[in-house]
Amino acid sequence: MFLVVQISCPREEHDVRTGKEYLAALNDGRTVWVGDELVADVSTHPKTRAYARSIADFYDLHHRPDLQDVMTFLDEDGVRRSMTWFQHRSKEDLLRKRRYLETVQRELGGGAIPRTPDVNNYVLLTYVDDPEPWSSQSVGTDGRDLTGGILDFWNVMRDGDLNATPAFVDPQADRSRDSAQAQSPALRVIATSDEGITVRGVKSISTGAAFGDWIHIGVFYRPGIVAEQIIYGAVKPNTPGVTIICRESNVRDGEEVEHPLASQGDELDSIIVFEDVLIPWNRVFHIGNPEHASLYPQRVFDWLHYHSLVRAMVKAELMLGLALLITEHIGTYQLPPVQARIARFAGFLQTLKAHVIASEDDGFFTPGGIYKPNVLMFDFGRAYYIEHITDLTHELVDLSGRAALIYPTEGQWERPELRPWLAALQTGPVGRPHDRLKISRVIRDMFLSDWGDRISTFENFNGTPLLAIRSLTMKRAEMSPTGTMADLARKVCGIESVTGDGEPETAYLAQADYARRQDGTRRNAR
């Protein structure tokens, strides 16, 4: 873990959590299963402690003097806070935020820890940016104003520098019929009272819920979903009736040398069971309106998706670097065919970087004054990553040859009777033989292990899979044949608009104005 050093000046209030404070907060009586074991304290159990320590390292990064200007900012009251809570209100602000997001990924294994608190909490911007529709469009609140609770939750999270892990995915119902959704065990409201709503059911996937301070509940709209299943809000993991059931762990606890990435911990995707759990009204963000939920499968996660593109860019840089290092060590780098193959990684990185920069350059201002990157740019950038990552993973392993698969353990390397033979096998034109082991271990952990395969699967379905990215993103801009996107084609073809004078009614324009204002397309403000 990192050494924590106080970096604030004597009169400056410092409100940034330390790793020690984070770890202490995890021992709160939450019910967590990992595989067949009931874990009493996720900060100390061998299957969970490594990841808890990695998140603690995330917090301690904010206390490094050399990173103060990158990791923290002074708010309007002169309080130094984590950049997690920085609301970017200009393009320059967004670039500062991106530098922060990149730094976190670079310092924590180049993408080995995808769901850090900075990305988990980024989602909350959607609510606080424009809270009114979340309240006014709710059904079943008896006229209660939910906006105060939404804004208060942001303040509680910010002031405590906490971590809210999203839980949005419902069980896979029989998708051959829409009516099956209503019969699924998905989380639903079973009662309302003056205190709040009582919920019962399941959220089938939540990444890192065992390690969060709060569980951020939401829903991805599906045809056939019923009003009782539309719930957005927050509960603490130790709330009575909440059980977190994690899959089997892939962590290589205590094997930092042999498994430099897998030893950093496993995020542990989980099922969360809610058995008659009370959510107070001040932690309810929205309930009861499937039409409202249908507008937000992507929009509520826009900030997470922008982050996932930044993370993909960092991972592409790591892959390019690994390809350069391993081919240099085995002596194939100078071969023209090999350099042509390495160029694919360079192109992959530059294309992702272009999507990031273009999304930032063509950004817009949301209703709450947040400067937001171009939605089409970062979502189709995510699609590009998913379309190409599998092929490039195979390319990297193929360029590595046996170096990624057959190499000695550290214990074998340290045996004097074996070292001369093993060193000869790892000797190339440049570099030390032991360095090749270090490169090979990273390639193996990231791309040839259960731990690495889990991250690859996560990235393919993070937020939305490829088909959903394409279909949902097409609904985020004017893509109808009668819309403006076809104006140039109509002009070149000499075709008049079929709608006559005035603005054509299209599927996109039929969406609620408050939702389209989160997209930033040129016609949204009309």
Model-derived regions, located:
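Acidic/polar, glycine-rich intrinsically disordered N-terminal extensions of enzymes
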Residues: C9-F73
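Extended amphipathic alpha-helical segments enriched in small hydrophobics
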Residues: H307-F365
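Short, charged, amphipathic alpha-helical segments
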Residues: P336-A343, Y371-D379
